[in-house]
């Protein structure tokens, strides 16, 4: 019992790291209109608000932010793991804990995109997010592995409101 209390207190005793400075993630800050085209052809439109949270350690993306009754709602947190030298993505949505996930990915050499990989017992999922600095548009390609084959689950296009 004492050991558990000690282990729980260790993170509290350490000072938090300095605010994360990341020019790539800074591009998420703001309000966005998102068009999501599902693999079955269905289209969903929603709003996303991006902001720095948790002492500037994560970008929070709130799908459905400001909508009265959003068709889809999710909270996505993206941060950087300094030890592993990769980005982390925590995703939770209206489909519940069964579908929540932790993905990891590296920023491409041109500083324009990250492909996050989420692994589970049912297979893998990737989400390749990219930013075009000229048009200021985000894109996202979400693919899912089913029976050894990769299929497009959804494609998104984000434009600033």
Regions found by a protein language model. Give the residues of each.
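Bacterial N-terminal signal peptides that target proteins for export
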Residues: 1-3
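Hydrophobic h-region of N-terminal signal peptides that target proteins for export
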Residues: 5-14
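Hydrophobic small-molecule pocket/channel-lining residues, especially in calycin-type beta-barrels
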Residues: 14-161
